Amino acid sequence: AQMDIFEQYFYDLNQFRRVPGNDTVHADMVDMLEEKISMFEFSREIPVIGDTATLSDIGDFYRLSSIVDPETNVSYESISRKEITLFQNSPLANPTARRPVYTMDLPNGRIRLFGRVPDDILVNYIGMPRRVNWTYVVVSGAKALYNANAPDLWHFQLHPSEETELVLKILTLAGFTLKDPNLLQIAAGEDAKNTQQEKQ
């Protein structure tokens, strides 16, 4: 349920960027979605070996925002792998230390740098919410007792405004699991009503 809501942020952001926004501080949908996504924005320095850096060490990696050379504070431009040959063969577009570029191979998370290859790069990215883990201990009578002090305790990470949506998603999933058509119908109806209200 948490991942469904999280991924919907990006689809909604894409949709709302297509329509004119407004200047109202607390009512612009693009601003609200960017605020929700900002909870998951992180930066991390990773080593470069040869001309390649790998994102596989970033366990919660979801989407790449930008790459920066930490020594010069210059941002790398993202280009496709098919464009790199065109860039390298063009005197005006050839990557340089002042205008470096990178290509990304998503399946294996490899980033290849062109123009300038530092020892490390600063990766600005959007991370995934961690999997919820409500810890417990088994007490006498084989009963589970919530353990708030466990080091692996992890709650939902969504924006507080998503509480209703999260409950409805969980109810929908519970309706499927319990095979309760009434519960499923109520949750689906509320979800549709909320979605319609957000789109207006």
Question: Predicted regions: what is each one?
Answer:
Residues 1-200:
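Glycine-enriched, solvent-exposed interface loops adjoining structured elements
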